[in-house]
């Protein structure tokens, strides 16, 4: 039974492959001709007013000199032994030339101290994500505040020859859907991202490209066919960063150089996006041994498609019983893939 579905329309089948019709995104929105990266860049990382305004309008803000280059060198040294990839990654979710270092905060104290705990990053994330609500309980009204928490912190090494990654919204892990709007509306975001360049990042070496203004797009606005004047490759120096909303379409680009491009991407989310009870921390793993797959999944030890709750892109249940979760990676992270047909009707 499907209790909450936001399908665009009913797909149709041709030769065993499902398709859906969509139109090219023609409207430039906020990305008017002549727009340059300077329009959504700040020189002062503590100019909160400017950062917030640019994120509201464009969905992102480039922050110059976010972290000292010497700290980038320290992070690269700490993270280097932890890069990996799986052979099944042949373009999805990453090109075969890309390696990742997941759970970076556990491998690098510098990442935790100087990136994730950075005051500006936390303050901006709280601005967009914090919630304060009032709940009736008996004869009183209780006010409760939900803060932020780290959703993910992964360092990506885009190697020479890597191809373009497909555009996506980061907040798909929480099945967040958005309706088209003319201007930013608070209360719809579940993530704020921070991309930090640990090496120089430009169009040639695989910089992140972003569709400016796409945080305002709805389900019928296609990230696969749009006016390319809305596309920007984030051109930044080592130590610079880019803040962006979880609803902004973004992707890694092809690396046409002979050098690796290394950057870390860190996402804050709402702190209530988790179970009420924490059953894992402080629990001996032997408690879970011998439990059937269904029980382990009900206890939160399986991935929610596409990636939510993973440990190194595997279900946490791998630590309990690798045999029960043996097809976790090979089967892919998506329940179904539907191809898009542009500009035609069934």
UniProtKB/Swiss-Prot annotation:
Cellular component annotations (GO), alphabetically ordered: cytoplasm
Record-linked Pfam families: PhyH
Keywords: Cytoplasm
Additional record remark: Present with 1600 molecules/cell in log phase SD medium.
Family designation: Belongs to the PhyH family.
Gene Ontology MF terms in the entry: phytanoyl-CoA dioxygenase activity
InterPro entries reported in the protein's UniProt record: PhyH, Phytyl_CoA_dOase-like
Gene3D superfamilies: q2cbj1_9rhob like domain
Keyword Cytoplasm listed: yes
Lineage: Eukaryota, Fungi, Dikarya, Ascomycota, Saccharomycotina
Location of this chain's protein in the cell: Cytoplasm
Superkingdom field: Eukaryota
Protein name, UniProt field: Uncharacterized protein YJR154W
One Gene Ontology biological process: fatty acid alpha-oxidation
Gene source species: Saccharomyces cerevisiae (strain ATCC 204508 / S288c) (Baker's yeast)
């Amino acid at each position: 039974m499907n209790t909450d579905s936001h399908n665009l329309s009913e797909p149709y089948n041709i030769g065993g492959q499902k398709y859906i019709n969509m139109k090219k995104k023609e409207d430039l929105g906020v990305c008017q001709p002549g727009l340059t990266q300077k329009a959504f860049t700040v020189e002062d990382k503590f100019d909160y007013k400017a950062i917030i305004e640019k994120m509201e309008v464009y969905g992102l803000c480039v922050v110059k000199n976010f972290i000292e280059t010497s700290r980038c060198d320290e992070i690269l040294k700490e993270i280097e032994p932890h890069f990996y990839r799986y052979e099944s990654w042949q373009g999805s979710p990453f090109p075969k030339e890309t390696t990742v270092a997941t759970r970076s905060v556990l491998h690098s104290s510098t990442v935790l101290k100087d990136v994730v705990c950075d005051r500006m990053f936390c303050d901006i994330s709280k601005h967009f994500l914090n919630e304060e609500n009032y709940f009736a309980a008996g004869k009183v009204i209780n006010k409760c505040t939900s803060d932020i928490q780290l959703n993910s912190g992964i360092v990506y090494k885009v190697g020479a020859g890597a191809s373009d990654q497909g555009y996506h919204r980061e907040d798909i892990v929480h099945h967040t859907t958005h309706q088209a709007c003319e201007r930013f509306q608070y209360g719809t975001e579940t993530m704020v991202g921070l991309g930090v360049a640990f090496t120089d990042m430009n169009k040639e070496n695989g910089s992140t490209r972003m569709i400016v203004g796409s945080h305002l797009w709805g389900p019928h606005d296609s990230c696969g066919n749009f006016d390319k004047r809305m596309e920007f490759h984030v051109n930044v120096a080592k130590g610079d960063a880019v803040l962006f909303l979880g609803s902004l379409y973004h992707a890694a680009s092809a690396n046409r150089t002979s050098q690796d491009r290394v950057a870390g991407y860190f996402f804050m989310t709402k702190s209530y996006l988790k179970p009420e009870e924490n059953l894992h921390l402080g629990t001996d793993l032997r408690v879970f041994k011998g439990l059937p797959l269904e029980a382990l999944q009900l206890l939160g030890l399986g991935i929610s498609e596409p990636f939510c709750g993973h440990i190194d892109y595997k279900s946490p249940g791998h630590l309990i019983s690798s045999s029960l979760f043996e097809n976790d990676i090979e089967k892919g992270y998506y329940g179904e893939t539907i191809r898009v047909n542009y500009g035609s009707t069934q």
